[in-house]
Amino acid sequence: ESAVTDRLSSSGYKSNVTGFSVGTKFEYLDDLKLGVSTKNLIEKITVDSTASSKQKKQEGNYFDSFIGLDFNYDKRNQKFQTTSGFFSNYSIDVPVLSETNTLNNSYIYKIYKELYENNISTFSLLFQSTTSLTGDDVKLSERLYIPGRKLRGFERGKVGPKDQSDFIGGNYISTLNATTTVPKLLENVQNVDLVMFADAANIWGVDYDDTLDNGEIRSSIGVGLDWL
């Protein structure tokens, strides 16, 4: 696998990753699937000339090897156009060989409910963390950003701590999201729902300079289209 993440304009760095991953999933108990994987990555990080001195220290080449575990408990009534039930997913990447020894955690929970006829309402939460087991600074590319779909109305990647003019992400993010469909307004349009939404999110933690941490809750409320 190969991937390029270009955040030079917004976050002051660019990452080129090459590597491979191998994994498998199996049903451990009813509705509970366990995934086990391993990935080995070679990464090159370059930083912008205007980046801070602490960011420039992270420029260079890296090799990382991780073992991943994924636990997925799925009680939805159906995978597509779900109307009831919930799913809960926890994943962790444990460093085996890594210069920064970064441990990644992610937990997602989402519940679906039909409050009235032809309505689908959801509530979800997300928590992610990226920290070093040995107290090192995690790489610029390992820092977390709030997904755009989790905080609508804000520019993607431009929320949270800043180092000079660069949005540098955080060691932790959390989000809460609620949506409810508005039936009958678009009932003649296929694969599109009109939804009301409320989002709240926080991003915090700057391990390489705690004076840059400005964690605060951002929120938005609105109406949008959901493409199925």
Predicted region positions:
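Outer-membrane beta-barrel pore proteins
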Residues: E1, Y28, Q78-F80
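Transmembrane beta-barrel architecture of outer-membrane proteins
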Residues: S2-D6, K14-F20, N40-K44, S65, ...
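C-terminal structured domain segments across diverse proteins
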Residues: T5-K14, F26-D31, V47
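Phosphate-binding glycine-rich loops and their immediate beta-loop-alpha structural context
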Residues: G23
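Acidic, glycine-rich low-complexity/disordered segments
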Residues: L29-Q55
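C-terminal outer-membrane beta-barrel translocator/porin domains of Gram-negative envelope proteins
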Residues: T46-N191, M196, W204-V206, T211
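Short basic (Lys/Arg) and small-residue
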Residues: D199
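C-terminal beta-signal and terminal closure region of outer-membrane beta-barrel proteins
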Residues: D207-L228
